[in-house]
Amino acid sequence: MSENSIDIALVQETYLKPNRPKACSIAGYVQLRTDRTYSSKGGTALYYRRSLHCGPINIPPLTNMEATGCRLAMTGHSTLVIVSVYLPSPKRLLRRDLRALFALGDAVILFGDFNCKNIRWGCPSNNYNGIKLDELEDRLDFGIIAPSTSTCFPMSSHIDPRR
């Protein structure tokens, strides 16, 4: 990551478990993670360069989302809260989960896999969570930035995401 000048990386669906606390550590980076303990898969992680003025934050209890976060202090700017979020696809997007995360600070950025599909963001179709997130964008006063290309590459696919 340092070769590509990455300061912060956010990961969802880590599949990491508490019995391997040093799994996936990266030299020169602090690893924060929230492992799913009640079943397989899931989990979130956040890596930040050791030289940054970052620190872990406590995530409030969430009903359907999984999250890991930090506070980033920057000279001349207010503190920024950065959160890696995973919403498993069978779970519903809940307003209370989003509100709890946005309440972590004055400037909060949520990155992650929300499993929300909406044609407004370039998806071929909508799903329940995509419609709900689109509605909540106005009600809770936040913005959505979605990638311009697909981020899902099924295992059976012959697409190489590195190209």
Regions found by a protein language model. Give the residues of each.
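A shared catalytic/ligand-binding motif for oxyanion handling
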Residues: 1-163
